[in-house]
Structures are given as structure tokens and as C-alpha cells.
Amino acid sequence: MAHEGSRQVRDRGVTRSKAEKVRPPTVPVPQVDIVPGRLSEAEWMALTALEEGEDVVGDILADLLARVMDSAFKVYLTQQCIPFTISQAREAMLQITEWRFLARDEGESAVAEDPTWGEDEEPSACTTDSWAQGSVPVLHASTSEGLENFQGEDPGGVDRIPLGRSWMGRGSQEQMESWEPSPQLRVTSAPPPTSELFQEAGPGGPVEEADGQSRGLSSAGSLSASFQLSVEEAPADDADPSLDPYLVASPQASTGRGHPLGFHLSLEDLYCCMPQLDAAGDRLELRSEGVPCIASGVLVSYPSVGGATRPSASCQQQRAGHSDVRLSAHHHRMRRKAAVKRLDPARLPCHWVRPLAEVLVPDSQTRPLEAYRGRQRGEKTKARAEPQALGPGTRVSPAAFFPLRPGIPFRDLDSGPALLFPTLNLGLSSPSLESKLPLPNSRIRFLTTHPVLPDVARSRSPKLWPSVRWPSGWEGKAELLGELWAGRTRVPPQGLELADREGQDPGRWPRTTPPVLEATSQVMWKPVLLPEALKLAPGVSMWNRSTQVLLSSGVPEQEDKEGSTFPPVEQHPIQTGAPKPR
């Protein structure tokens, strides 16, 4: 056992010696300085740990201080609630008191001397967009300027200018027609030129016939005038400068451009050139002061032959007056440039019809119908026995349907047979696409459009409204409306007095066809109250269609006099029930 113990000790010593021999030598770790010679790495780590602790403590103190200040502010608000309320009430009372006593505002003092005050500048006009829709430049030039420019464009080739004709037509139509140029200066007024003058026409050009125009103009209708002026001159070297530049033009230049030259005259030019009726209305005189008085139908020609100006054979008797014509034309042009006469609205041609209406106070008890229409009932029945259709030129005066006050013009429509009826206004609007109206049922019945009226409408003894008193002055209108409904209206010819109408044939008087209402809208009508439950005011009557009884108030009314000629009136109220089969 001792031997084994010594062996172990010996082995341990050998192992320890081997280990000491194999262990390498330790190398010292070099020291790193954060700040060379001042702050090492170990000192830096110690300072960093200390600063982190201070940051944690600072956050805790800031949180504690915020809680304390919040609690203190709440206590302050609680203490200042009453003083704040008192101050707000004081300011409100002071403001209300100031409203009761308004102070005058003196405004700004010395505004003219204050350099900060000044007049606003005019805003600049907006720029017109040439690409905008409807942006088209339009030049409006007066007539006189257009004539001067027109002459200045072509001063060499001066020949003629066709003037226009205005105020021609019938009725209320006013039209302007261009006249074709003529190589003569012609002043035409009724009567037409004689045959001798037409036969003496020289080589200046063909003479146009004017019988058609004179035959179509009416002496008692509207004012119709025919005035043509055209002057032919020699070439530019032989042209007389005293001629009126308003009457010259260049047809050669117009032919080269491919369209005729012309212009629209103003109202002043037409009014100056038109023949006007004098006070007596029996003759025509020329208003133009520049043109001398020429006999009706005389043709004055200025042809250009051989470069010289000479009159034609039709005006050889007035050879000595050519210079006067030129001087008067020049004088007229100078006067036109000096001052243009203004139009007199009272003398302008007006086309209207003044119906002759007689204002009467009709006697409602004796003859209300004759006071309104001016004819006996027997003559009306005789004239009604022979109906006749209206001709294309027949005109019916509106005074036959409703009275007009004197002095009120009534314009006549000149488009075919002018038959006028009073407008029947039912107070119903036409249904639109969005209207929700129910379809018509059997309760609604409209009048048929057949030309033959029902027998009830043509009955000679229709039922009268018993004990009905119309207001004073309305009896004739009520009867006329009833006859229009029944189709027995006779309208006398317009413009004829009572004596003239008696001499005419009653069969020639026009007959009017009563207008028949057509179904243009769907109207549902249902009575809200029964007629028997209504309480009528004194003097008011209502016709009950179902019972054929006239409902009236309790006040008794006087009976009609025996001499009263009250007209029959047909009553067609709205159907409230289904129509009964006949």
C-alpha cells in the first residue's frame, strides 16, 4: 500500500511540471484613453452610468411637478369663477347702455389732404375671346358715311345707283323691294304716264311699263308711292361735279365683283323722297326740296352717248331746266350734309283699323239688344235665314263682338280672312308630360266636332233663366254670348252704317260658324257640395242641371216686364253625371 501511494505522488509531480512547461506567458492588456492623458475608458464608463441615473430621477421629478401644477390650476379656476361672471355681466350691461345712446361718427378728417385716400381707377375692359361661341365682330355704320365711302371707293366709273321702294303693301305689312336699275330718271305718281310720253322715249334705253303697279295701288287704302332715281353720266373727264353724289354708282365695278351694288336707305332718306299727302288729302307733292316739281309720268333721261351729256326726246321741252335740276340737286346735297331733318312720328304711315264704337247707356228693361247691336230683332232673323260663307277678303270688325273705347287703335291682321272672335278662357292649363292626370271616363263628355250642332242648341224656344237680373250694361253681352254658343250670330259688314246695311242684300252678309270646344285636356271635376246644400246670397241664382230648377235666394225678385225683349240664352253647364241615352 505504501508503494502505491508513493507512485501517485510521483505521477502528480511529473504532470505538474509538464503543465508549467506548456502554459504560454501572459501578455498585459494595453490601457485605452478616451481623452489622452486625461480620461481613460474605465472613467468614461463610470461617468455614463452616473448620467443615466440622473435622467431617471429628472423624469420622476417632472411628472410630479406637472401633477402638482394641474391641481393648483383647478383650485385657481374654482376661486375665479365668481369674479369672471361678474366682469362679463358688467361688460354686457355697459354695451347695452351704449346702444341706447348712439354716438355720432365724425368720419375721416381731412380726406383731401390724406395721401392714403384716392379715387379708384377705371377697371380695364376684359379681353374678348375670339374663340368664344358667338364672338363675331359686327360693324354698324350710318347711312351717310356708307354713301361717302361707297363713292370714294370707285370715283372714276360713276354711273348709277338703284334706290329702293319702301312702304309698299297692304294691311300691316311693310316691306322693301329692290328695284332694278333704269337708265332714266323717272318720277312716277298716280296717274300713270301717258302713251305719248312712252312713244317719245329716246335712245337712252327701254321704258318700263308702270300700269301694273298703278293698277295695284288703291287710292283709299294705304299710301303707295313709286319713286325711282338713276342718273347716267359721261366718263370721268367730262363728268359734271355738280351732280349729286348720292345718285351715282359704278355698275362696271359691281359686274367685275360678281354682285350688284346696293344699300338700304334710312328712314330719313325714304321719308324725304316719298310723296306725302297734303292737309286736304287730294293731291301728292314731293317732299324732296332738291328735285323740282315734275309732271306726273314725265321721263327725264341722261344718256351717255359720245362722251357728252344731252337730254332725250321725252324731255326736249325742259332742255333749259337741266342746269336748274343739277343746281337744286347740289343744293339738296349740301342741305342734307348740313342738317338731317328729324322724322315726325305723327306723319309716319301707320296701318291700323279704328273700329267705330258708339258708347251708349242701354236700357236693361226695354231694348238691351238694340242698344248693343244697333239693329232690330226682326231684321236679324231675316238676315239669318240665308247663310253664306265668308269670302277671302271679308273682314269682321271686332266691335261687333265686344265694345272698344274710342281712340284705341285695333291692328288688323292682313293674312287671309280676318275673322276675330273673343277669347274663351276656361282657366285651365294644358297638361304637360309630367302631369299625372287620370284617363277620362264616362263622366266626362265634350262637344262633338261635327259641323251639325245638336237640336238643343238650335232650338228656337230654349229655356230661359227665370227671374235673372243681369247687371246694368251687361244684358247685350249675355245675349251675344248665348247666340255665339247656339250658332245664330250674324255679323254685319265692317265700315257700313245702318242706312247702308239696310239697302244691301241680306244674303250677302257673312255668317259666322260658332267655335266648338275640343277635348284638349283631361279634367276631372267632382262637386264638393250638393246644390241643395248651398245657401245663396240675396240676388244670386244658380241653375241645377240635374233637377232643371233654378235655385235662388229667399229674397223675392221682381218679374220681367211684358215689353222686355230679353234674348234666349242657352246654358250648358259641366256634366256631373253619366249622359243619358236619347
From Swiss-Prot:
Signal peptide from the UniProt entry: none
Alphabetical UniProt keywords: Phosphoprotein
This protein's record includes keyword Ribosomal protein: no
InterPro entries per record: DUF4639
Residue numbers carrying Phosphoserine: S242
Domain of life (superkingdom): Eukaryota
PANTHER family (UniProt xref): CHROMOSOME 2 OPEN READING FRAME 81, SI:DKEY-97L20.6
Start-end of Polar residues biased regions: 311-320
Biased composition (Basic and acidic residues): 1-23
Pfam families: DUF4639
Name recorded for this polypeptide: Uncharacterized protein C2orf81
Segments of this protein annotated with the region Disordered: 1-29, 110-133, 147-221, 310-331, 551-582
